[in-house]
Structure formats: structure tokens, C-alpha cells
Amino acid sequence: MALTGFRAGRQTRLDYRARRHRVSTAVGDNEVIERIDAFCDAVPRRRARPDEYGPLVIFVPTGSGWPYYARPRRGSRPPVTAADIRAVRARQRELVIPESFEWIEQTAPEMAAAAAEAGLEVQAHPLMMLAGPVHVPPLPPGVTVRIIGPEDPELDRVWAVPAVAFSHPGTRAGEAGAAERDKIAADHDAGTIAMLRERLRSGHSVLAAVFGPDGPLAAGSCQAVDGVAEITGVGVLPTERRRGLGAAVTALLAADARDRGVQTIFLSASDDAVARVYARIGFREIGTAMIAEPAR
């Protein structure tokens, strides 16, 4: 599915064949997975035109912004084959959009093998839902966490935090920090920030960040459709990792979504180590989020 957060958040490639036998579902999980799958189909339709190709659908961008993925059609459909994926890849090349596919493994179990046969690299990520109360982790001294409004003067620097984080993948501490964040913020495209500001005004997205004396240190976002919300793009400056800041952002976004009446709150973890962090907040693994794209 491409869970909309996968692309920003993935950092580690996991063997989808190994994961398939590790995920056990509880009573009611299939219903939750169905709601999440509907969410992943609905979100791209806000800013893209759906074009169906056999059992798959491509979301063709209708304006600026991040290009979307292809995914299995919802409802009754034939199984996805390698030939279907090759046909969609050809169309994606014609449209000059990424040859990317995202789906939930439990809704299209045949698709991983088809994607691999079609020459794509297949990645698997823990799909998790908030299963109880939000456990808010303690913050280190000298930092605060808050929701960011559309007119917040720090909006551009908050936006830049995940850009730095995901250009230095992994969870280990590193040297990139405030200077890199501020450079990206200074060089930002005004249209991108304007689009983000509009999404915050409309309520389509919620943004949160952790702040220290030198500005934003961690950030993430959440978007909701029809009672389902995804937390996505949680990133921490490499200089600030291993301090619980990403967990603080995630917990605030989850609590905020619940306060707004959202019933199903989910996310995807980049790997099992990150999944354990989310588990301490109150998330539980219910399935597997899949990505397939050309090997880099």
C-alpha cells in the first residue's frame, strides 16, 4: 500500500518471505487492515487521477507534490501477475513517474512474488496500529514538543528536519544536524511550503515537532481520511538520535489524532528495531506493508 509514510520513512530492507510467517493477527485485525487499505486508496485521489490497468491502479499526479505509487485495485479483481506489473511499469515510464508499487501484503499476497518476477526489489515493513492508550515517553531536559500550525514561523525549518533525517538513513547518531537543516530550509521551494501550509489549514495534515534551544530537532506528520489516520515521515536529526525524540513526536501525533476522534491510527516501521520503539508507545503489529521498485 504504499502506505503514504513508507517512502519517507523506510530505511532498512527486510525479507518479505521471512516476515510472512511472523505476523499473527488477532480478532478484528482483518477489519482494521481493510480500513487501512481503503485509506491508502483514498489518500492519492485527493491530488491524483486514478487510472486502472487490469488488477492495478496508477495514481497520475494532477499538480505539484510527491508522485504517488501504483497499487492493487480494491474490490473484486484477478490476481496480480508479473505481466501486469511490467505493463504498469511501462506506463509509469511514459508518465515520467517513479516505477513504484505499494500495498498491504495481507490484501494481495500474490503480489510480492509477481513484483520480484517482474524485476523489482521487494521490501517489507511492519504495519502497526495503535492498540490502546498512548504511552507518552519522557522528554530529555531542555526540549519541548508541540503541534505546528500553518502560520508557525518555524514551519520551513520543521519541514527540513525529515529531509535531513532521511538523507542519512538508519537510527545511529551522526554528524548532520542544525546546520544542514537550516541550509535546506533556506533553499526550500516556496511552492512546497505553500502546499504544506494549505494542507495544515485544511486539516488534511497535522505536523508536530520537538524543539531544542537551536530549533526543531525531530518532526513528523499525520493525515486522516474517514476515521483512519496514518503517522508518517517521522525523522530526527542525526545529531539528536537515540534520545527518544522520534517517539515523542509519534506519541503527540497519536494522541492528537485520538483527541480529534480518529478511530484507527496506524503507521509503518522501517525495521523491527523501530517497531519496538513504536510498541512502547502503544502500537501493535497487525500486518506487513510492502514496497516494490527498481533496485538502486
Regions found by a protein language model. Name each.
Residues 49-54, 110-121, 204-218:
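Conserved beta-hairpin
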Residues 177-178, 187-235:
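A conserved beta-strand-loop-helix scaffold within acyl/acetyltransferase catalytic domains
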